[in-house]
Amino acid sequence: FGGSTASELDINDEALQREIAYWWATQTVAPTYTSVIKGTPMEILEIVQQMDANGETYSIGIYKEDGSGGHAITPFGVEDKGNGLFAILVYDNNYPGETRELYVDSRDNTWLYEASINPQVQSELYTGNADTQTLDLTPTSSRLDTQQCPFCDGSGISSVGGKLAAPSLQGSQINQI
């Protein structure tokens, strides 16, 4: 796509936009959506620690406890910081070129990460514990499988038709069935 790092890519490149849209869309359908692993901070940490051994890679979904925000980051390692504190090393596309750390405290099964939903928004502290279920993992392998089309089998709206109604410039209604 014309860059040696993600931050060097031209966001206006149509082929790149299509690629980004494809990978984003995979998160909404099976098998990707049904392969998401939800867990406590310690369960998520343990899976990330096994990435090299099991050959799988993941994206981590982080969510605000009130559901008002979320973001995906890419883990690539774990550091033991001592005293029960671990740092999951991540790539965050909102901070290109930086190694970021999602902290997991094994003493109370909590996590925290400072993030923003996009680079133009002030960062906030995302936190959670074993009860909040605000961390998840999406296996990369599930995104490489053929994705299921939720409306192609005739069970979606396309099988029963739909109605579109829009006002004309003169104020009357135009209908399409």
Where are these regions (language model features)?
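Cys-His-centered catalytic/binding microenvironment captured across papain-like cysteine peptidases
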Residues: G67-G70, E79-I177
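Glutamate identity and glutamate-enriched acidic tracts
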Residues: E8, E14, E19, E43-E46, ...
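Cysteine-nucleophile protease catalytic domains, especially the papain-like/related folds used
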Residues: F1-M42
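Active-site-adjacent substructure of cysteine-protease-like catalytic cores
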Residues: V36-V90
